Amino acid sequence: MVNFKNTIRMNHPYLLWSLLPGFSLFTGCTVSPKKEVIKSDDRLPNVIYIFSDDLGFGDLSCYGATKIQTPHIDSLAAQGAQFMNAYASSATSTPSRFCLLTGAYPWLYENTEIATGNAGMIIDTACVTMADLFKNAGYVTGAIGKWHLGLGGPNGPDWNGEITPSPRNIGFDYDFVIPATVDRVPCVYVENDRVVNLDPKDPIFVDYNKKVGNWPTGKENPELLKMKSSHGHDNTIINGIGRIGYMTGGKSALWVDEDIADTIVSKAKAFIAKNKENPFFLYLGTQDVHVPRIPHPRFAGKSDLGVRGDVILQLDWTIGQLMHTLDSLGIANNTLFIFTSDNGPVIDDGYIDGALENLNGHTPMGIYR
């Protein structure tokens, strides 16, 4: 599947080339000793790597979209290097992310297909990852947003206790993640190995084979849905939306779909501000424009392309917020900002949300259709 591009914001081009040779060290998910952190007096460039979700080459105005405008992402393209012929390692989420972080072809490894929400950690903790390379070079490392690479041991995570292994076992100093995808249970955030806001008196149970608890499902109670499914996505209902998989418990920890982008941005801003005096690497996976597409009210109805267009606007806002944060902290000129997508566009991916009907001449595939 064709990926749309990488756009790199840089005021000093040599920073890009000084960074890239480090990535040439990737030879696959080898089991190698973790090296000691390299100390240096030189100020290393901060690196922010944005992995958007299911975004197409033709979804951005800097790539010719005329039905929607993405000014903040366009600004990145104008200031940096805009790739016109880049490719994703895989056409789906989990294997694409696995390859990015490990440098390994996912089809050579077991369990790298699309992960369930209760899958164990897919990346071996002995593997040297991209995060390890940054950490060894003296960076503070963070993973925020969509994860979808499994958590916990071979039998999956303990949602009610310490969740390990986690991103913090493969090179990240800090994590605040969506365990899988926003259409899969559990619909909770995990921060530094613990479910956020979990009430121990209301433990979480998750199953992908059979129903657990008595929470309604899309199949049994379609009248409770605010967004109906076109195929699948009819298991446990969370926030009026049928999900893949079953869960019960953890009511105080459940996310609100309309607020996910704001939450991710808030956590990213806090990480950047906290580490403004240190070189940092931030890996940020957005939930946009993956299903279910539930934009914040600020963006609902603001595009001419229905909810899929609305969440593209929300994604562009996300990038703008991060750019503004870098500018306000005075570190934009020393930050590499890389923006790409995990794979190409998906239009109808399980919900009746009008995405196909509201294209109005918009072509997410762009020139690759």
What role is predicted for each listed range?
Residues 17-25:
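Sec-dependent N-terminal signal peptides
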Residues 24, 29-369:
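Formylglycine-dependent sulfatase
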Residues 1-2, 31:
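Secreted/periplasmic carbohydrate-active enzymes, especially glycoside hydrolases
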Residues 4-17:
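Bacterial N-terminal signal peptides that target proteins for export
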